[in-house]
């Protein structure tokens, strides 16, 4: 089965949240690794916000604090980069449990930002019987 999730966010929305709440906002939403990867670039933070939303949609759940009590925590979905700089997803906690429940074998992620918008698309594949263990 194929699962998809997509999200788009105005970079200015994330910029305003950072200006208003500062490190409190950043630490609530993003992991230390995500923050380090963004080097303070609001566009990169916005793309990772969109990635978290896209993956949550792919999993069929919301983000806790956005999508209600049944959602996953922001830190349960981490949007990082592999050794070649390609976007990758690390799941933990409730997000990891939901992916296993769905039999997801892999998640692919694409991020972009331009003209004040950031977008992410996540695609996951599952099989009827798990072929291998996920890295998370």
Curated annotation (Swiss-Prot):
Alphabetic keyword roster? Cytoplasm, Fatty acid biosynthesis, Fatty acid metabolism, Lipid biosynthesis, Lipid metabolism, Magnesium, Metal-binding, Transferase
User: Is RNA-binding set as a keyword in this record?
Assistant: no
Predominant place of localization: cytoplasm
Pfam families assigned to the protein according to its UniProt record, in alphabetical order: ACPS
Q: Where does the UniProt annotation locate this protein?
A: Cytoplasm
Q: Coiled-coil region(s) at which residues?
A: none
Question: Which transformation does this protein catalyse, written as a reaction?
Answer: apo-[ACP] + CoA = holo-[ACP] + adenosine 3',5'-bisphosphate + H(+)
Query: Taxonomically, which superkingdom?
Result: Bacteria
Q: Does the keyword GTP-binding apply?
A: no
Which Gene Ontology terms of cellular component type are present? Answer: cytoplasm
Q: What cofactor does this protein call for?
A: Mg(2+)
Q: Which InterPro entries match?
A: 4-PPantetheinyl_Trfase_dom (IPR008278), 4-PPantetheinyl_Trfase_dom_sf (IPR037143), ACPS (IPR002582), Ppantetheine-prot_Trfase_dom (IPR004568)
- Molecular function (Gene Ontology), one example: magnesium ion binding
- Binding-site list for Mg(2+): 7, 53
Could you tell me the EC number(s) of this protein?
A: 2.7.8.7
Its GO biological process terms?
fatty acid biosynthetic process
Functional note? Transfers the 4'-phosphopantetheine moiety from coenzyme A to a Ser of acyl-carrier-protein.
Family to which this protein belongs: Belongs to the P-Pant transferase superfamily. AcpS family.
- The entry's protein name is Holo-[acyl-carrier-protein] synthase
Species in which this protein is naturally found: Roseiflexus castenholzii (strain DSM 13941 / HLO8)
